[in-house]
Amino acid sequence: MARHLLQLIVLFALAGCAPATLAPPPPTAAVDPYTGERAAMVHEQIAGRGVRNSAVLAALSKVERHRFVPEEYARAAYADHPLPIGYGQTISQPYIVALMSEALEVKPGDRVLEIGTGSGYQAAVLAAMGAEVYTVEIIPELASQAAAVLGELGYTNVHTQNADGYFGWEAHAPYDAIIVTAAPDHLPQALGQQLKEGGRLVIPIGPVGSVQTLWLFEKQNGELTATNLGAVSFVPLTGGTK
């Protein structure tokens, strides 16, 4: 009897020591290796140069700029200069993106038209500020690439179109704000027409291969008034014919 009792005790002890089946650990979020560089960019290059709009600073702190440049330029993504993205186009330097975004005075829910999607970075910044963004790119390959990256990063409030941005995107007009990221030699008439009353339009204007002027146009009583925001250098706006 004592021996049988001892065997039962041993069996229970062994059962208690058996390893439990553990649930697999939850997947870990991908680590962003550029968090520090992005914070330094915002502090030194943007806030340090006078940009004060909290929504702009928050968006630039959040948007992963390195995801919008070719892989070989990822390490330079947060430096304050433009970078090539292919097809003769560039991603604007962070300070210019911030300056133009601040000038638009975008509010959550605003409908914003962007002419010149390029890499998609400017659209992502505006989307992170809460805007509903409609962006037009004339180069099919860039339009496709930008749409793919924006989709991967979850920017559901950005709508892309491969078309000639000189004529805007009339189907979704009027817009609270319009931003143009390439330089024509004049203000396209369609853009002024598609701007909502009280809206703001930021655009570089000037000759190809020379210094251009960044302008802020504000629409009041159907008229556009212009403010000079300073000298800039952008790739030319192509298209403009039907």
Where are these regions (language model features)?
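Solvent-exposed, acidic/flexible segments
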Residues: 31-39, 49-53, 89-97, 115, ...
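Conserved nucleotide-cofactor-binding alpha/beta core module
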Residues: 105-225
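SAM/dcSAM-binding transferase cores
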Residues: 12, 19-37, 175, 193, ...
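Sec-dependent signal peptide recognition
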Residues: 2-11
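Short clusters of hydrophobic/aromatic residues that line enzyme substrate/ligand-binding pockets
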Residues: 68-69, 78, 83-85, 169, ...
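Solvent-exposed, polar/charged alpha-helical surfaces in well-ordered, non-transmembrane soluble domains
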Residues: 39, 43-44, 54, 58, ...
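Conserved alpha-helix/loop element of class I SAM-dependent methyltransferases that forms part
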Residues: 40-43, 48, 77-87, 91-109
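N-terminal auxiliary segments of SAM/dcSAM-dependent transferases
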Residues: 17-72
